[in-house]
Amino acid sequence: MAETPRPAEHTSSLKIYFRLLSYVKPYVGIFLLSIVGFVIFASTQPMLAGILKYFVDGLSNPEAVLFPNVPYLRDLQLLQAVPLLIILIAAWQGLGSFLGNYFLAKVSLSLVHDLRVALFNKLLVLPNRYFDNHNSGHLISRITFNVTMVTGAATDAIKVVIREGLTVVFLFAYLLWMNWHLTLVMVAILPVIAVMVSIASKKFRKQSKKIQVAMGDVTHVASETIQGYRVVRSFGGEAYEQQRFGQASQSNTDKQLRMTKTGSLYTPMLQLVIYSAMAALMFLVLFLRGDSTAGDLVAYITAAGLLPKPIRQLSEVSSTIQKGLAGAESIFEQLDEAPEVDTGTVEKERVEGRLEVRNLSFTYPGTEREVLSDISFVAEPGQMIALVGRSGSGKSTLAALIPRFYHHDKGQILLDGVEIEHYRLRNLRRHVSQVTQHVTLFNDTVANNIAYGDLAGAPRADIEAAAADAYAKEFVDRLPKGFDTEVGENGVLLSGGQRQRLAIARALLKNAPLLILDEATSALDTESERHIQAALDHVMQGRTTLVIAHRLSTIEKADQILVMDQGRLVERGTHTELLAANGHYARLHAMGLDEPAKADIT
């Protein structure tokens, strides 16, 4: 492969890293305090080497004084001074260690929190197409796994760079002060170390990206299996899911091992280089000892012996940084995604509910086939419009365009005479309620599931009234804690009919003038279907309703039926008119339109 992109890659890495460090700005005071702690810690390393000089010299003359020219200390002999200094150095080092480790941990944990919140908040404003193109496992993995790796680069790596870097600087300064000629031998190995670090960094970065993708796959498979555990058990999919998860986990393990192998080879090679330089240095110290005292030689060798550990840790930090940079790339990629387009300025307290669609066409982003083509119709306030057609005819897509989950390419959608693009997005969605066949409930109480989002804080009386109108209160009152009963993840503790009635109660409490209804009840028992039909009749009263219709009983009551086929409106009229026309609708009716499983109208 050509190596020309390297400078750009280097610049990109620096750009990502500096952007990552920008998240530390709110904690700069705490961060500086941690740096002070690491400076204190690093300063003790040459002190420990220096104290050995006085200890060795004191063996031959314990009554010698340590500070002959300092008032009040000129009588302090080595016998008392050396033990006292060791205790003071240890206390000084402990203070530095506490300040550095505690306050950097505080910065690190705050950074984890900030990045996770930023990622989660971004998810809430991203357009639908983003979720269409990214599986949930990878999105969750970014918030959990990737963020942890990133904070390692932003804080843990800095800890090593500052603490061990300053240790190396202080030790080198001490060695130069003692014998600068010999110290140049140690300096000679630095270019070799730099080359090794550069080569290893590229490998770590590449392998880290692969590990993150593999970890996302593990999360995705586990998430899918847990969410669909009933289907897995019903269709005997245990063996298949075990195999799928095992393959994803094994792939992640293999990639982790490759990175470990790289690090395991890199560290001993680096140590060999460092200790070879140490061997040469010791030979020269013994060969060229000159007029140095035994204490001088011991102090010099000790200081030189303290160098390999921080140098090795500095070189190994490259792995942490590259892992973090790989994670940061994916995080910033999500944070840089454009949010939902919201350029509208119109806000209305309440609309009448007149819906007009003019020459509407739509193509999903990244595809070429037109899903909707030249659709036009008008729904007057309070009217019910039924959308009928085979699966894939574009009914659900049309319904998704009204609350602007997607943006149409051509034509107009007007609510009370105003193009929906001109409404502020949040205001537009306040005027629209949706009840779909895929009910979403949260792991919370019945009351909080009905009064969700903007409805939170609604009076209990209003919540109970909405539940009563949705024919839900009768079963809610039988629950252990009534409206304060937890419903489990996605309402798992409730039946399908009960979940749908809570969704209808939510729509009733919202009291929006425009209702979009996917009226699927084919999976319910007769009693549940009867209750839900009564609830739906109630929720549609006085509201403009767009129904993706499945049953004949609903269609017969519609003010207008729109028959769709391959993204086009092929027929429109009332039930009687369309039967008389003997066209698409009549054929669907003959197939048993009141039987969704046969008609496959979704």
From Swiss-Prot:
Residues 32-323 form the ABC transmembrane type-1 domain. InterPro entries: AAA+_ATPase, ABC1_TM_dom, ABC1_TM_sf, ABC_transporter-like_ATP-bd, ABC_transporter-like_CS, ABC_transpr_lipidA, P-loop_NTPase, Type_1_exporter. It is a multi-pass membrane protein. Keywords: ATP-binding, Cell inner membrane, Cell membrane, Lipid transport, Membrane, Nucleotide-binding, Translocase, Transmembrane, Transmembrane helix, Transport. Its EC number is 7.5.2.6. The chain crosses the membrane at residues 28-48, 84-104, 158-178, 180-200, 268-288. ATP binds at residues 389-396. Pfam families: ABC_membrane (PF00664), ABC_tran (PF00005). It catalyses: ATP + H2O + lipid A-core oligosaccharideSide 1 = ADP + phosphate + lipid A-core oligosaccharideSide 2. Residues 355-591 form the ABC transporter domain. SMART domains: AAA. Homodimer. Belongs to the ABC transporter superfamily. Lipid exporter (TC 3.A.1.106) family. Involved in lipopolysaccharide (LPS) biosynthesis. Translocates lipid A-core from the inner to the outer leaflet of the inner membrane. Transmembrane domains (TMD) form a pore in the inner membrane and the ATP-binding domain (NBD) is responsible for energy generation. In MsbA the ATP-binding domain (NBD) and the transmembrane domain (TMD) are fused. This is ATP-dependent lipid A-core flippase. The lineage of its organism: Bacteria, Pseudomonadati, Pseudomonadota, Gammaproteobacteria, Pseudomonadales.
